[in-house]
Every structure is written in structure tokens, then in C-alpha cells.
Amino acid sequence: RKGEKDDLYDLASLTKTTATLLAVMKLYDEGKFGLTDRISQYIPALKGTDKERVTIEELLLHQSGIPAFWPFYKETIDKDSYKGSFYRARPDASHHTQIDTRLYVIDKFDYRKELMAKTFSADYPLQVADSMFLHRSFRDSIMVQIGRIPLKDRRYRYSCLNFMLLKEMVENISKMPMNLFLDKEFYKPMEMNRTAYLPLRQFKKEEIVPTVKADYLRKGKVLQGYVHYESAAFMGGVSGNAGLFSTARDVAKVYQLLIDGGVYNGKRYLSRETCDLFLTHTSKISRRGLGFDKPDVNNSVKSPCAEEAPEEV
């Protein structure tokens, strides 16, 4: 069918600035943490790991040393359900699905029965897709896995894991699930009525645009109303790196709020000082800002912004 202006889309990594960063800015505004604070002060699972001294600023600038990606979902897969390698650099008789450049996955595999169920229950509340529910313990195990991943050097390295940790910090400080915190502080009062994590709890499936035709981790199902990015999916759909669904109109409200120094429709949500800091601070080793990407004024080809974008963006 023809798309409608109120259709919801999976925002993917735009979740980072449309959701997680808003929550981080709000808590910073309230004096709940400092940028040079160590993230382990707010996430006990990181104490005693090589992440213990990583600061919140380093997470926001993507200079934490944490790898760009980690396949958390592999812990849920039954290794006895397939033969040979799960991944291949080239397609063969049992590896037809391409998921990246020179990377193909096994065609048939099963999940560990103790971690994945077909129906919802108190023990299996984390819905990944239709008829796919993860054990409640898996969300916490992801934080443990992040703690065990070896740190790399502290150069600029864009990482979804940085924002997964920031989401965990938001929840530990606010004592609320981040989706509910955002609803309370921003989305509901700003009348962003077409913005939500876990959109199928509020909207009909027909109101949500399908993301992919067949997802290999969801057993070839059409993905509609469930977050596509696997790390967010295996967090139960609410994550710091992905998971938010919205419309262009609602997304515009967030960035109008930021452009206007924390005010939207006559109401103040963030101080101008906090907005100025997060919008203008720039890394000393990359073009990145505090959570935001910024223009590369020295190389317009590599810049993520249009050439017409002003340098002060």
C-alpha cells in the first residue's frame, strides 16, 4: 500500500540521539552525573573489568575503546543444531544468506531451548519477533558480556555498545525503564503520540512499515513492529542503540527542541546551557560531538552532512 504520513518506521541508529541522548541530557541537566564520571559508578557489572575507568564523555564521543559490534545473539544459538561454521566468507551449499561484505551465515539452526520459547511467560518476557521470546536473564547477561569484551585503543570507533551502556546508566540513575522515562519527560508532554519503543503494544501492525522481508535471526519472518538491529532485539526491544519507532513529524519535534535551546511549544525541557554544551562540544581527535555526529569541515566527501550545512552545526 501507499505510505501514510503517520506510518511508523524503525529509526535504527537514530534512536541514539532521538531517545538515549535526550535521556542522558536530561539527567545531566539535573546534575545526576558529570561527563568525567566513570560509567562503572552507575553500572556495577563493569566494576573490576577493563571498562571500570571508561568515562561517560568517552562513551558519548565513541572513544571508549569498546569494539564497534558484538554478536550477543550467538549465546542463544544451539551449537549442536548445525554442522561446520556458523559464518563463511563465501556462499556454499549451507550458507546462502549474506549479512555483510564477505560474510554469510548458516541456513538452518535452532535456538537453545532454555533461552528461547515460542510463547510469552514470566520467564520468557523479551519478545524478539512473532512467536520468539527470550529468557528474562538474557538482558542482564548482555551487560556481563560487555564487561568481558577486551578493550581496544582509545581512538575514535563508532560503537553501538557505548549507547547500550548509556541506556543502562539512564535506567540505574532514574530508577525507571528508559522508554517510560522518555515518555514522561519528553514524548507525552511534547505530544509525540506516534513515537514508541515496542510499538505493537500501542499500534496496529498495519500502522508500522515493515523493515525487512526476511530476517535470518527471526527465521525468515517479515519484520514488522520489531526492531531490526539484533543487539537491540535481544535486549527485548528497548535499547540505547536502536529500538525506537516514530514518524518524520515526531522526530522533527526533538530536533526543533534542541535547535531552540531546550524549549518546545513554549515549554522548557532542557536548559540552554546543556543544549549548548552537547551541541557544540567537539572531540579533540575526531569530528564527533557529545553523542552527535558533526560535519567534517576539512573533508566534505567524508562529511555526514550536506555541503550546505553550516560549520557551527
Language model: regions and residue ranges:
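Short, surface-exposed loop or secondary-structure junction motifs
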Residues: E52-E312
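Short active-site loop at a secondary-structure junction
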Residues: K2-L61, I149-N162, S239-A242
